[in-house]
From Swiss-Prot:
It comes from Escherichia coli (strain K12). Signal peptide: none annotated. It is a multi-pass membrane protein. Belongs to the FHIPEP (flagella/HR/invasion proteins export pore) family. This is Putative truncated flagellar export/assembly protein LfhA. The gene is lfhA. Gene3D superfamilies: FHIPEP family, domain 1, FHIPEP family, domain 3, FHIPEP family, domain 4. The chain crosses the membrane at residues 86-106, 124-144, 177-197. It comes from the Bacteria. Keywords: Cell inner membrane, Cell membrane, Membrane, Transmembrane, Transmembrane helix. The keyword Hydrolase does not apply. GO terms for cellular component: plasma membrane. Its main location: membrane.
Length: 579
């Protein structure tokens, strides 16, 4: 009966006490760990923004948080296996018991008492052999899930706690010795274990505990001093504002995963290359980082540390954009293109072939984000162009025309050049032909230092490249100003210049006239687009800076040219007049 009671005790402890408790603890730990994950991520971002940690340390801490969540999630599932193992052991025990008795009675013709005695004894022996490893497994799982997390590994914690005091080893020594002298027990193994534990306890009692405590105290003090010195505020710890950055919600982070081919990184690199080539200046690197303050499928674009735009897109879907050849409607979530606001449908990846067959343009999430970044960055290029870019631009000029570069540096200082270059970039004029631009600036700087007039002279020299995108078969279709409006604006500009020095793009205008521009300029733009023409407004040279500024405000995409910027070989076709 001793064996039976032992088996029942092991079953009770294993199933009711150990596995039940470990299962409950693992469930609670997993839930609490996952619930606390956003807060931990926000704390890491706060420390990073405050300069308490650097980017590498923040990345390491994020990985630790993710690993902890994965661990407790895995242990939650593992506890189900452990509990299932205990239940399976009980079921196997019952099957062996009932099956053995039945075999003894019906196959071997034993009496019920003899069969019960024989097969119960065999079942208990098998059950003990199976339940002891199961109990050890359950206990190990319980120890892991109930452990308080710190910076040490579990083996280190167990060793420190078991060997924390010699009295623990002395107690174990006494128990081993008592077992060694019990009749019927294996004397030699227990005596050896007793001697080993006693010797270990004796050696530990001889160690200077005071020295160990002093060493730990010194180590703690050193670590505190080191961390304090590393976190002192200095110029190096103050984070610099990044010119361009892209923040991603955690569901979009997979778009920059190396295992998936870095689709977003590749497209952003392409955007930077295209914009740099088109404008003749090197665009700053576009930094991509995760931001747990954003919604899971949200991203935000920052220019010089300020949020320029943001959007929320389904991370696991494709964007189906209707075209002129589209027929029918495809099932999906209706929405708008983040960059241009066009109506689109978000579809599953499995619907891609169907959407293409129906005439839709299918765009993946990485391309959607890259297109949005391209649109935003292009509108901020003048703000991103700075003094260092002038240096790099002039270095390129020096490699092809060193004397011209020297004359340009002598004619205009960096502050004046920055205004001219930014004025050109604001109106979409590329700086690739830096030799022509520098030649004009050197010649015109002897007459004026006004950046608006200097930019106008550069535009005149680059008139063919400026008008080229709008020309169709040597014909340029334009809108002009109504004669009455042109005379009125000319008088306003002349009176402003007589009253003092006024920038041509900042001449004060009557509010009623501004309201008129606000309504008529978009109309001109839409009418020309509806006719399949590029929106172009042709105006007198002295009015072009002012009207170009209003066009950027009221009708982005409406290009304003002056009469003298139209090459002589082109034929003008006047489509209408701006009233």
């Amino acid at each position: 009966m001793l064996s039976r009671s032992d088996l029942l005790t092991l079953l009770t402890i294993n199933f009711i006490v150990v596995t039940k408790g470990a299962e409950r603890i693992s469930e609670v730990s997993a839930r609490f760990t996952l619930d606390a994950m956003p807060g931990k991520q926000m704390a890491i971002d706060a420390d990073l923004n405050a300069g308490l940690i650097n980017q590498a340390q923040a990345q390491t801490r994020r990985k630790d948080v993710a690993s902890e969540a994965d661990f407790y999630g895995a242990m939650d599932g593992a506890s189900k296996f452990v509990r299932g193992d205990a239940i399976a052991g009980m079921m196997i025990l019952a099957i062996n018991l009932i099956g053995g008795v039945c075999i003894g009675i019906f196959k071997y013709n034993l009496s019920a008492d003899a069969a019960f005695q024989q097969y119960v004894l065999m079942t208990i022996g098998d059950g003990l052999v199976a339940q002891i490893p199961s109990l050890l497994l359950s206990t190990a799982a319980a120890i892991i899930v109930t452990r308080v997390s710190d910076n040490g590994d579990i083996a280190h914690d167990v060793r420190n706690q078991l060997l924390a005091s010699p009295s623990v080893l002395y107690t174990a020594t006494g128990i081993m010795f008592v077992l060694a002298v019990v009749p019927g027990m294996p004397h030699l193994p227990f005596l050896l274990f007793s001697a080993l534990l006693g010797f270990t306890g004796w050696r530990m009692s001889k160690q200077p505990l005071a020295a160990e405590a002093e060493e730990k105290s010194l180590e703690t003090l050193t670590r505190t001093i080191t961390e304090t010195s590393e976190q002192q505020v200095s110029w190096e710890t103050i984070p610099l504002i990044e010119p361009i950055s892209l923040s991603l919600g955690y569901k979009l982070v997979a778009l920059v995963d190396k295992a998936q081919g870095n689709p977003l990184t590749q497209r952003i690199r392409g955007v930077r290359q295209v914009i740099s080539d088109g404008n003749g200046v090197l665009l700053p690197e576009i930094r991509i980082r995760e931001n747990f303050r954003l919604k899971p499928s949200q991203y935000a674009i920052f220019i010089n540390g300020i949020k320029a735009d943001e959007a929320d897109i389904p991370a696991d879907k494709l964007m189906a954009l209707p075209s002129s050849e589209t027929y029918g409607e495809i099932d999906g979530v209706q929405g708008n293109d983040p960059a241009y606001g066009m109506p689109v449908t978000w579809i599953q990846a499995a619907q891609k072939a169907k959407a293409l067959n129906m005439g839709y343009q299918v765009i993946d999430s990485a391309s959607v984000i890259a297109t949005h970044v391209n649109k935003i960055v292009r509108s901020y290029i003048p703000d991103l162009f700075n003094y260092d870019d002038i240096t790099q631009l002039h270095n390129r000029l020096s490699s092809t025309a060193p004397r011209l570069a020297e004359d340009l540096s002598a004619a205009l200082n960096y502050s004046q050049l920055l205004k001219v270059y930014r004025a050109l970039l604001t109106e979409g004029v590329s700086l690739r032909d830096i030799v022509t631009i520098a030649t004009v600036l050197v010649a015109s700087s002897t007459v004026t230092k006004d950046h608006i007039l200097l930019a106008a002279d550069v535009r005149l020299a680059l008139r063919r490249s400026i008008t080229h995108p709008f020309v169709r078969k040597q014909e340029l279709t334009v809108y002009t100003l109504n004669n009455e409006l042109e005379n009125l604006l000319t008088n306003v500009v002349n009176q402003a210049q007589q009253g003092g020095k006024v920038m041509l793009d900042s001449v004060p205008v009557d509010p009623n006239m501004l309201n008129q521009f606000q309504s008529t300029m978009p109309q001109v733009k839409e009418q020309m687009k509806a006719a399949g023409k590029d929106p172009v407004l042709l105006v007198p040279p002295q009015l072009r800076p002012l009207l170009a500024r209003y066009a950027r405000l009221f009708a982005p995409g409406l290009h304003v040219l002056s009469y003298n910027e139209v090459p002589d070989e082109l034929e003008l076709k006047i489509m209408g007049a701006l009233m």
